[in-house]
Amino acid sequence: MPPLTDPERSRCYLNALANWRYDGFIVFMKDAVRWLRAELPDPSLRELGRLLYEHVEANGCTCVDEQIETREGWRDRHPFHHDIRMPVAGRLIYFETRLIYRDPGDPDDPLIQVVNAHDA
């Protein structure tokens, strides 16, 4: 799977993750929340945001897979989705995310939606 190497999207992705302490920058959507609460009741969603940030910060955005969105119903709204596989609580977890931004020059503009999570 191709890594996230585009400089603008990489910067925006890391900027969104860097704001993990604040509401609205990493948004866990209902399907991801449902699985995470059932399978990994600890850590909290905020803690998962911190772990995602630390993982990408330590390994660079090339640890994030960038997929061209081809699925019906999504490809018209999102050109890409981004996948992260990382250890959490002794398990390898897959996170499917969407990067949303309008102003790549504003570090507080981008946000990430975590739309799915499951064992990798």
For each predicted feature, which ranges?
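Compact soluble domain cores
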Residues: M1-H78
